[in-house]
Structures are given as structure tokens and as C-alpha cells.
């Protein structure tokens, strides 16, 4: 069994066994636990799940999008990444400029009505095409507000200046590795009402010991089946990339969850996943010629020996 994957599978088991049923913003309903922690030793393998196929290309393009300080889905769409489509699409169909079919509560309706789902998928496809082809439209409706990229790279101060938290934390790791202030936060209370989706992975901290870089993430809200596998791999990748720039080896990724939940319409999927036997964890390859985290492109990041079971589809709660 892959040691790297086991903490995640145990999280699923614990929620199924001990979770509390709760209502939620999306109207779907969840089983939930509060205050849960997983630890992944990054030296033992890269924590990309093997009990279902996780598309690593989406993970690395999203992380590069964050690191660019970008908040517009156009970059993602140009890399065939549709993770954030629904939130930008929601802004579009709720605007005065939208005159197409009624898209009220499109997330739930698409799950319950096959005919509506076809209309919804068609409208969303047209929206995404227009984002890519029309810069003015993309500027207006492709922007998600002050989400991760903005907060990481362009945190707005009260005097009108900006803070590049990623640059600052890398400099601190290099020059003062024993600091307890190596923190990046995406949670800005002033900006929360203005974001398409307030940051779920809210704050992360680095720790250096014995030449190894570890990272701990606090995630306020954790969609365990769909979101958490991406979050684990994304922050593991970020830790590897920053370790490369700072001349360190990788240590642990510690994942602390606030509200860790499985949506009620994902229960069949998680039970199917638990029936599968994990394979050995893959390894991460970073282009050895790239030293600066901002210089990485898609082709500079790969996973090797990734052998997974098939994907398991599930609806996104919006």
C-alpha cells in the first residue's frame, strides 16, 4: 500500500464513520468533521492519489496561475483548465448583460435535470469560448476578484501599496530559516465579499529543519472528494518548487482542515474509491535548469511513474 496516500483515505473513513450531517451554502448537504490533520512525508513519494485518476496538468496550471498573481480564468482556459469556470460563469449569468436561458441555481438543476444540463453545458461552453476570444469580455467577466493570485502576490495595504507574500516568504526562508513568521495568507476580510469564492485554503506556513522545508496549510473549507486531492498535490508541488529555489530538501506537507466535508451526492463515489487498492506513489520531476519559482512553465513540471485507477466523476457544488 502507498504510505503517502493513506492519510487521505483515513480521512474519508473517519468522515463516513464519525461525520455530522449538515446543511451548506450550496443546498446539497454534507457529512462533516471539524479540525482534522493529515501529514505527508514528501521524501516518500509525491502525494498524487492513485485510487482515482487526478489530472496533474490541471494542478500545475492552476498553481502557476496563482504564482503569476493572475485572477482571470483566461489563462486557465488557454491551458484547457476548467476548474474555476462555474464561478466566473455564475457572475456572467447573474449580470444585466446576460440574456440567455434562465440559469438560476444552475449547479443543482444540472444534477437533477438532464435536459437542463445540456442547455447549461452549451451556455457555459459558449461563455468559455468568448473569454478566450474576446479580451474585453474576459476582462469584465473572466475575473474572479481578489482570489489567491491577488492575495499571494499583490496584497493591498491600507496606504495603497502592495505586498508580494511569495517573494517575501522565499527571502525569509533563505535569510532567516528559523523564523516563525514564514506565512502566506489569502484571507483578507475586506475582500471576502468581493471574491467569487472566498479562499478555502486560507493560510500556509513554512518550517525549516535539518536542511528540509516543510509546509503546513490551514484550509477553512475542504471538499474532501473533489477539492482536497488537488490541494494536497498543489501544496506539495509548491513546497518542492520553493525548496528548489532555497536550496533545501523537502520535508513534510501538513494539511490541517477546518470543516472537512463530503457532499451527500458524493457518498457513492467515495465508497467506490475506498474499495480500490492504492498503487505506489509517483515521483515529481522539476526541470533542473530552473531555480527560480517564477521561471517555471508547464513543461518544466512532470510526474513520473503515475499509475492510477480510473477517474471517478462527481458534480461540483457551486
Swiss-Prot record:
Belongs to the thymidylate synthase family. Bacterial-type ThyA subfamily. SUPFAM superfamilies: Thymidylate synthase/dCMP hydroxymethylase (SSF55831). InterPro entries: Thymidate_synth/dCMP_Mease (IPR045097), Thymidate_synth/dCMP_Mease_dom (IPR023451), Thymidate_synth/dCMP_Mease_sf (IPR036926), Thymidylate_synthase (IPR000398), Thymidylate_synthase_AS (IPR020940). The active site is at residue 200. Pathway: Pyrimidine metabolism; dTTP biosynthesis. It is an enzyme of class 2 (transferase). One of its GO terms (molecular function) is thymidylate synthase activity. The lineage of its organism: Bacteria, Bacillati, Bacillota, Bacilli, Lactobacillales. This is Thymidylate synthase. One of its GO terms (cellular component) is cytosol. Catalyzes the reductive methylation of 2'-deoxyuridine-5'-monophosphate (dUMP) to 2'-deoxythymidine-5'-monophosphate (dTMP) while utilizing 5,10-methylenetetrahydrofolate (mTHF) as the methyl donor and reductant in the reaction, yielding dihydrofolate (DHF) as a by-product. This enzymatic reaction provides an intracellular de novo source of dTMP, an essential precursor for DNA biosynthesis. Keywords: Cytoplasm, Methyltransferase, Nucleotide biosynthesis, Transferase. It catalyses: dUMP + (6R)-5,10-methylene-5,6,7,8-tetrahydrofolate = 7,8-dihydrofolate + dTMP. DUMP binds at residues 25, 180-181, 220-223, 231, 261-263. (6R)-5,10-methylene-5,6,7,8-tetrahydrofolate binds at residues 223, 317. One of its GO terms (biological process) is methylation. Homodimer. Its EC number is 2.1.1.45. It comes from the Bacteria. It is found in: Cytoplasm. Its main location: cytoplasm. PROSITE patterns: THYMIDYLATE_SYNTHASE.
Amino acid at each position: 500500500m502507498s504510505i503517502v496516500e493513506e492519510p487521505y483515505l483515513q480521512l474519508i473513513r473517519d468522515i463516513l464513520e464519525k461525520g455530522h450531517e449538515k446543511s451548506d451554502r450550496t443546498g446539497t448537504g454534507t457529512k462533516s468533521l471539524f479540525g482534522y490533520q493529515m501529514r505527508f512525508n514528501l521524501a516518500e513519494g509525491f502525494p498524487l492519489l492513485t485510487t482515482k485518476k487526478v489530472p496533474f496538468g490541471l494542478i500545475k496550471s492552476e498553481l502557476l496561475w496563482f504564482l503569476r498573481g493572475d485572477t482571470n480564468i483566461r489563462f486557465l482556459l488557454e491551458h484547457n483548465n476548467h476548474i474555476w469556470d462555474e464561478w466566473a460563469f455564475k457572475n456572467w449569468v447573474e449580470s444585466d448583460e446576460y440574456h440567455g436561458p434562465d440559469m438560476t441555481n444552475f449547479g443543482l438543476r444540472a444534477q437533477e435535470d438532464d435536459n437542463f444540463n445540456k442547455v447549461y453545458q452549451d451556455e457555459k461552453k459558449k461563455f468559455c469560448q468568448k473569454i478566450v476570444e474576446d479580451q474585453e469580455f474576459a476582462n469584465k467577466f473572466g475575473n474572479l476578484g481578489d482570489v489567491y493570485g491577488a492575495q499571494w502576490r499583490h496584497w493591498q495595504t491600507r496606504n495603497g501599496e502592495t505586498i508580494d507574500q511569495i517573494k517575501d516568504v522565499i527571502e525569509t526562508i533563505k535569510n532567516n530559516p528559523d523564523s516563525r513568521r514564514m506565512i502566506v495568507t489569502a484571507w483578507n476580510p475586506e475582500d471576502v465579499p468581493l471574491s467569487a469564492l472566498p479562499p478555502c485554503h486560507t493560510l500556509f506556513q513554512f518550517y525549516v529543519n535539518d536542511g528540509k522545508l516543510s509546509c503546513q496549510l490551514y484550509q477553512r473549507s475542504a471538499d474532501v472528494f473533489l477539492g482536497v486531492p488537488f490541494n494536497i498535490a498543489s501544496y506539495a508541488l509548491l513546497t518542492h518548487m520553493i525548496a528548489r529555489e532555497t536550496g533545501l530538501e523537502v520535508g513534510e506537507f501538513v494539511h490541517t482542515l477546518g470543516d472537512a466535508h463530503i457532499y451527500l451526492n458524493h457518498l457513492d463515489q467515495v465508497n467506490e474509491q475506498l474499495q480500490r487498492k492504492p498503487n505506489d506513489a509517483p515521483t515529481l520531476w522539476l526541470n533542473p535548469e530552473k531555480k527560480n519559482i517564477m521561471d517555471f512553465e508547464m513543461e518544466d513540471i512532470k510526474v513520473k511513474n503515475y499509475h492510477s485507477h480510473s477517474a471517478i466523476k462527481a458534480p461540483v457544488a457551486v
